[in-house]
């Protein structure tokens, strides 16, 4: 199994480094991908969650599903199809994968680079519903970025205020305010700007220094407290923590492509656009 996973992670890493094969749910570093599929990938065994096609003992196609059994959904890793292979190979991988998963999964999500035409055609042939467009933005380590004195780490007495702000700002997201609180540790933190009445704004950051990976997962400012520079202050605080305290060189975040004001805010804080992405949903019935 170890050699099998190493071969798959190498194949995915090489493919995902190219925009025309890029899938947003997985990275492009072999060691990080290997760690994820070995320890964090899917609620089901890897053998059930990844379909692979070979030709002359060489991998020519991979499609994985990061399954959440709790809600019957999965994020698609792929399809990754070797150049020169027919597009129908992606459909063969799909049939293989969905046959294994059966009724354990009813909804699949795809998140693909706009230049990934194979994935776009694949989604269209499956009758997927196209969702919103997103930007993946990166910020690289800068000198002199410090955490503003207005910013504090979330304290226990502000937990209720944080949950209220987060759940109102992101009512339908994948992680509730309570979920975030359960994850907090030395690599996952919430920073806030507060008043006596409660939290004006917050940012939730997640770092994986062993893989040089850091993300700004959520950021929100109370609507009554906007236009005070709080968003920029929080973004810079997040970068200072991830860059300086965890030693992460590149920080990423995903932004709705239609949120021009947010994109400008992140640009002022040091982020730049690196990928333009499309989101898809495939619902299956049995």
Predicted regions and their residues:
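Conserved active-site alpha-helix within GNAT-family acetyltransferase domains
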Residues: 114-132, 232, 257-275
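Active-site rim helix/loop that mediates acceptor-substrate recognition in acyltransferases
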Residues: 15-16, 24-49, 170-196, 204
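Short amphipathic alpha-helix that is part of the acyltransferase structural core
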Residues: 1-35, 134, 145-173
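Conserved acetyl-CoA-binding loop-helix of GNAT-fold acetyltransferases
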Residues: 85-99, 125, 221, 227-241, ...
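Conserved donor-binding loop and adjoining core beta-sheet/short helix segment
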Residues: 32-92, 203-217, 222
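Conserved GNAT acetyl-CoA-binding A-motif
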Residues: 101-113, 242-254
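Glycine/small-residue-rich hydrophobic helix-like segments
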Residues: 180-246
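Conserved beta-strand-loop-alpha-helix junction that forms the acyl-donor binding cleft
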Residues: 81, 109-119, 252-263, 280-286
């Amino acid at each position: 199994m170890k050699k099998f996973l190493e071969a798959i992670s190498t194949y995915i890493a090489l493919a995902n480094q190219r925009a025309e094969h890029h899938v947003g749910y997985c990275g492009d570093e072999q060691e990080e991908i290997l760690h994820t599929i070995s320890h964090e990938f899917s609620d089901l065994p890897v053998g059930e969650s990844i379909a692979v096609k070979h030709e002359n003992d060489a991998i020519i196609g991979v499609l994985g599903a990061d399954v959440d059994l709790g809600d019957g959904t999965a994020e698609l890793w792929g399809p990754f199809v070797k150049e020169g292979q027919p597009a129908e190979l992606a459909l063969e991988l799909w049939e293989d994968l969905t046959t294994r998963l059966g009724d354990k999964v009813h909804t699949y999500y795809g998140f693909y680079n706009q230049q990934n035409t194979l994935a776009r055609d694949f989604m269209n042939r499956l009758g997927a519903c196209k969702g919103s467009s997103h930007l993946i933005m990166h910020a690289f380590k800068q000198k002199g970025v410090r955490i503003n004195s207005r910013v504090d780490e979330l304290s226990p007495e502000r937990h209720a205020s944080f949950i209220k702000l987060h759940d109102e700002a992101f009512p339908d997201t994948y992680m509730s305010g309570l979920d975030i609180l359960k994850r907090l540790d030395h690599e996952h933190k919430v920073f806030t700007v507060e008043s006596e009445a409660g939290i004006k704004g917050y940012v939730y950051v997640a770092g994986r220094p062993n893989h040089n990976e850091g993300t700004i997962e959520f950021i929100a400012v109370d609507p009554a407290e906007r236009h005070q520079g709080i968003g920029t202050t929080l973004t810079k605080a997040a970068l200072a923590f991830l860059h300086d305290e965890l030693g992460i060189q590149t920080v990423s975040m995903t932004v709705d492509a239609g949120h021009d004001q947010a994109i400008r805010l992140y640009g002022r804080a040091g982020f730049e656009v690196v990928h333009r992405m499309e989101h898809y949903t495939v619902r299956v019935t049995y």
